[in-house]
Amino acid sequence: MDELIWEKYPYLYETHLHTSESSACSRSTGAEMARACKEYGYTGIFVTDHNWGGNTAVDRSLPWDEWVDIFALGYEHAKAEGDQIGLDVFFGYEAGYQGTEFLIYGIDAAWMKDHPELVKATVEEQYCLVHEAGGLVIHAHPYREEAYIPEIRLYPEWVDGVEGINATHSNPQSTGHNDPQYDLRAVAYAREHKLPISAGSDIHGTHLFGGGVAFRRKLTSVADYARAILTGEDYVLTDGAKWYDKFGNVIEGNR
């Protein structure tokens, strides 16, 4: 990481992370992910496991409250470990709609239990529900092309921002979904609709890429993160290999 950028923006957050307790595609537990991220130098992480509409590890036939309790275990284990080692851990999830996915921030498991209608909510209804709770909806990797994504669908009116930098697309260490064009198109889409841009690693194991969003100050909560993104606070983005300004432009001279 470039030392000058690191000095100006010392608080790095992983915004897209999966755990094996809750995401069927993840290889590492919440506690293992927390330890790896702390060792890497992250200030905090957002646990964003796949929900019922995506690659969840939780039995969809369970009663709703029980499903939520088990779904939250990845976050809870990461949070318990983070509290011990000095890593901030925040709750979120990745909502799936036949391959189109959204990162949800600013709500918690208790709120989910109170809103079982989430399971059948449309993209538009999801946005309204999350907003009523003061949350944030980010369109995850909108231009990724994979077998599990039958078509690219865009919802600029029903998101608060776009994950323009996804480290699995652009970090040289990535062995899956690796195509920088996905990010270039996502950034262009965000600019066209004047939507804030975020970054994350979409990480599923302890071999970290180092992607995320870095701030000049330490975040106090998920709500604080939402405010920072929505109000245009000063931050930078990274895929772990390059740094970008908040508009998705490569910061020249970084390494």
Regions inferred by a protein language model and the residue ranges of each:
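Charged catalytic cores and adjacent phosphate/nucleic-acid-binding surfaces used
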Residues: 1-15, 19, 30-35, 98-110, ...
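An N-terminally biased module of ancient metal coordination in phosphate/nucleic-acid-related enzymes
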Residues: 1-97, 205-207
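Short, solvent-exposed loop/turn segments at secondary-structure boundaries
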Residues: 23-28, 59, 114-117, 174-177
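Conserved beta-strand positions in the central sheet of alpha/beta enzyme cores
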Residues: 45-47, 138-139, 163
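Glycine-rich tight-turn/loop motif centered on a GG-T
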Residues: 64-65, 110-116
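Well-ordered, non-membrane alpha-helical segments in soluble/globular domains
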Residues: 65-78, 119-124, 179-183
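Extracellular glycoside hydrolase catalytic/binding regions
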Residues: 142-145
